[in-house]
Each structure stands twice: as structure tokens, then as C-alpha cells.
Amino acid sequence: SSAASDVYKRQVLMIRDGDDVQLDNIARSVIANNAADCHIALHWDSTTSNKGAFYMSVPDVASYKNMEPVKSHWQQHNALGASLVSGLKGAGVKIFSGGSMAMDLTQTSYSTVPSIDIELGDKASDHSQSTLNQLGDGLVAGVKAYFGQ
């Protein structure tokens, strides 16, 4: 698609592409902080309810939101997540609930670049090439919208 072709203007740094967890979440965040404009962790959870896509938002807890680097970056994290969900919704992807679920994650606790963990489905979700293309198109649209392109 045209949205997907534009993504090649940005470089994607794949930190992990399987279940091998040689690098922990802090190490992945450090890599992203030093080498990326944003950090997007793509996940398919282990449930079988086919509930749809959503992002892990920063919890609305004052003690957490007042801790650095969260204090300086939580709004960027949530804005990136909302933009990705909007892009996915626009591509016709099923969205869970309001599109977000509050969760205290290591990734957002240590990130100084916009960083989000997004669940794209689960074991019951369709994993066909056409669905993966649809997810990719939605994510590209969300990234482009976030960066104002």
C-alpha cells in the first residue's frame, strides 16, 4: 500500500523478533533511547478471546507519573499509543475496549523517547498475511500521524 511504501523512508531497528529474551526490557529501552525516534513493542498475548488491539497506557498514579523519566515523557508515550490505535482502527482492525489498558511497564519507566507496548491480538486472532498487512498498514498510518506526516 502507499502508506507502507512511505515507511521505508524511516529505518526500523528490530531489537527482538522471537521468544529469545537475551536483552531485558531495560536494555531494550536503553537501545531505543540511543538509536530511535520512538520505541514500539509489538505483542500478541497468550489469551484466546480474540479481543482486539490495544496499547498499554501509563497508569494514572501520581507517584508513578512524578518519577523521572516518566514525568517528562508519559504524555508522549500515551499520544504514540493513541495514534497507533487510531491508525489500526482506520485500517479496519478490531480495537479492544477504548483502545488502551493502564499498566506499569519497565519499557515506559526507562524510556526517554516515545515508547509503547501494543497488543495486536492473541492466539485466537487471524495471523494470515492479509491480516498482518492490515496491521502493518495501520501501524504505519499511526506512526506517520504521530510524527505529523
Pin down the residues of each PLM region:
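Active-site-proximal helix/loop segments of hydrolytic enzymes
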Residues: 2-149
